[in-house]
From Swiss-Prot:
Biased composition range(s): Low complexity: 664-673, 680-709
Protein name: Probable outer membrane protein PmpF
Organism: Chlamydia trachomatis serovar D (strain ATCC VR-885 / DSM 19411 / UW-3/Cx)
Stretches the record annotates as Disordered: 664-709
Leader peptide range in chain numbering: 1-25
All residue ranges annotated as the Autotransporter domain in the record: 755-1034
Alphabetized Gene3D superfamilies for the sequence: Autotransporter beta-domain
Main location: secreted
Alphabetical list of InterPro entries matching this protein: Autotransporte_beta, Autotransporte_beta_dom_sf, Polymorphic_membr_middle, POMP_repeat
This protein's record includes keyword Isomerase: no
Keywords: Cell outer membrane, Cell wall, Membrane, Secreted, Signal, Transmembrane, Transmembrane beta strand
Membrane as UniProt keyword: yes
Any single Pfam family the record assigns to this protein: ChlamPMP_M
Family statement: Belongs to the PMP outer membrane protein family.
Amino acid sequence: MIKRTSLSFACLSFFYLSTISILQANETDTLQFRRFTFSDREIQFVLDPASLITAQNIVLSNLQSNGTGACTISGNTQTQIFSNSVNTTADSGGAFDMVTTSFTASDNANLLFCNNYCTHNKGGGAIRSGGPIRFLNNQDVLFYNNISAGAKYVGTGDHNEKNRGGALYATTITLTGNRTLAFINNMSGDCGGAISADTQISITDTVKGILFENNHTLNHIPYTQAENMARGGAICSRRDLCSISNNSGPIVFNYNQGGKGGAISATRCVIDNNKERIIFSNNSSLGWSQSSSASNGGAIQTTQGFTLRNNKGSIYFDSNTATHAGGAINCGYIDIRDNGPVYFLNNSAAWGAAFNLSKPRSATNYIHTGTGDIVFNNNVVFTLDGNLLGKRKLFHINNNEITPYTLSLGAKKDTRIYFYDLFQWERVKENTSNNPPSPTSRNTITVNPETEFSGAVVFSYNQMSSDIRTLMGKEHNYIKEAPTTLKFGTLAIEDDAELEIFNIPFTQNPTSLLALGSGATLTVGKHGKLNITNLGVILPIILKEGKSPPCIRVNPQDMTQNTGTGQTPSSTSSISTPMIIFNGRLSIVDENYESVYDSMDLSRGKAEQLILSIETTNDGQLDSNWQSSLNTSLLSPPHYGYQGLWTPNWITTTYTITLNNNSSAPTSATSIAEQKKTSETFTPSNTTTASIPNIKASAGSGSGSASNSGEVTITKHTLVVNWAPVGYIVDPIRRGDLIANSLVHSGRNMTMGLRSLLPDNSWFALQGAATTLFTKQQKRLSYHGYSSASKGYTVSSQASGAHGHKFLLSFSQSSDKMKEKETNNRLSSRYYLSALCFEHPMFDRIALIGAAACNYGTHNMRSFYGTKKSSKGKFHSTTLGASLRCELRDSMPLRSIMLTPFAQALFSRTEPASIRESGDLARLFTLEQAHTAVVSPIGIKGAYSSDTWPTLSWEMELAYQPTLYWKRPLLNTLLIQNNGSWVTTNTPLAKHSFYGRGSHSLKFSHLKLFANYQAEVATSTVSHYINAGGALVF
């Protein structure tokens, strides 16, 4: 017997109300929920009086003498509800008054476990098993408001307390193939607010969605590490793996709370191969103890590794909190690779706002992009020091000795890793006695380790307000003790960000780019060394008003000694060995780290532009031939875009700064950042020592104590350039050949249509036909080729006069798709053609056939640049056409075949409206010259008709078609983002071609069926035109 009560139901749609609402979780107070949708019903929790209801399809097996056994629920086609049970029996869960050695629920309809309560210390608010728990291939599975808590506590050291698993507790738990899983408002007194297992937990192959919301652990044993007992606000795998894999719907962990791991606690956690979005939001680790806090991992806590791989949807770690370390994740090492976009936003902790790395063993940490960016933004640390409150630091790394312990940062093509918060990598010495650390340390950092990583790793303060930047003071990005190598792709420092290399070498491969943007600073400290082989300056941002050039500098203060408040700072002026080594060229790049010549407006000259500065405290810190080693000629290889000449010039000045060891409090005005902003007034013509105000140390924070200080002289080398433009060469992928080719193609449509307007011998006819046109244009010279396919219909009416005059009125409509061969550029069109044809007989042997037509086209164009950039535009065109054909009839019979010579002139003229694109690299096209063509096929026509009924007729034409007059379409084109301009025209065509037409008809009394085929062949172009249909003839 199972104690159950009913729930009140009202029809609505699925439980996605909860899962989708999580996208705005911070606006939703789930504690206020009294109803939600589940399995196409809206559920409101109203408890009926307790009643005993016989459970359906429950099988007990392998029963033992002590009453234990295996429990299976399977094959139910109606919703099964297990609710309002209170169980105090040892070893059994809240919903079942029995001890199970295993529990399996498979192939059921909906299963609801609600308001069950387990008070004994063995755990399992709804279900407990001494072996495995398995939920397999069920429909919607819901655990709501189940509780495992309330056992009698026997003392301060009772480590055997087992109020585990607010909903489920077993040795292993497997949830596979279910349609949906929802665990809401469950609570345990020990680990696993919703689910707890002694070993592995596996959640796989869920069809629609997974939701863990508002689950809690609470532990009131007065034990010095109580948070260890209450870990895993939603899920706890006590000694093994938690795996969430191969699920098809969204996965949401929202508002869960635990002592460690606000959502998940495990030895290892793997989330991989899921297809939809994954969200960890508003989870919190709020453990407590009698001594120091160890509440780590606001969302996830593992003692070993955390793996996030091959997930297709967007992934969010948003607004998670830990009272100690790891606002989002606490783990031994991280493995983030090959996912969709990943966002770490608004997480907070006392140490490591995003990550706390405990380093239990040697490991490689991976932060690699997949198909989207990885973004770290507004992750904040909080401390008892109000001056430090609100600082944005991503990492906290435990200070234990592990080797090798490495980090790999990799951004794949067209993706980026954005560090908008401080990246501070430290405490990774091989041996703490090594001071300075060994430059050959195995605890390395590698940026873009393989050729597939051609994207960018970006350090930027773009998302930091001025108040936050002031609060940061001397704090900045740095790498300590880990030799760093940039192998491929780009490492960028932008938007006033600073990256300092402490104590170790930074090495760059020539296959990579080190890009510096506005206000960026690359600093090398004592015992450090910069080996730069390919330096780029992000020019468009530097040229904006109020922006300053980047700087590469030696830290004037020796940060290895005398850094405490009250100590006299030491400088690096005594170091005379090279610390900044150049061995390559200087490039000018844009915001995408590509050639600047085709992305910014360089149509006007620029004079005395500061683009880079290099600062040292001793002349020996640069190679003696550093100016020649850093190739500043700025002579780029042949390139598209603006052409011109750079004239570089180095200007050397000196200035003095005051060192100090003040705190980085907001009240301190002597931070490095402030010194850089206020210490010098510079003009390009000034080559003498600048007049520098002597900056005194501030007491800072109102403490009333002054800091000792010292002065150091800085030598500053500033690169000033002049630019003289001489022209613009367009990149063929941006040239717009397809636009001009579409105008020629419209003329070809007109020509094909006019050639088909040939009246027959009927007195009156109504005709309809389906049409297709295929065209293949070869690439010629540097112009792109294309292929096109169109389909449509045509209707016409013909009438004949008393003297052999014939009139034909035709209308056709077609849709056309064009695609360039070398690019993915496409154009789709609709054409509407109206034509009037007139046949006039002369001298009984000559027939003149004239026609006039108008073809109106609407076009949608899409251009692609790489994998992520594209532009689109709409325009229309008008084509006017005319033809005149002369046939010499009744003159050349060959048995029963009539051969008729003919000559024809075909005229077309196409004009487009102006075209303005939107999107990336948008262009503006305006007409300079319309496309005009006159061709004249000269050939012979053969006709044959049978004397039988129905009448069979064949007709064939062969002709040589020279081009008598040709004007290429010319479009003045402007690349809007940089004012680069050029003339767009079509792919060159052969001036001579051959034309053939064949037709076949079958005529009954008043019904005619026909099929026509035309082909035009030239060395540049091949076209095929087919129309087939029927006519009523009289």
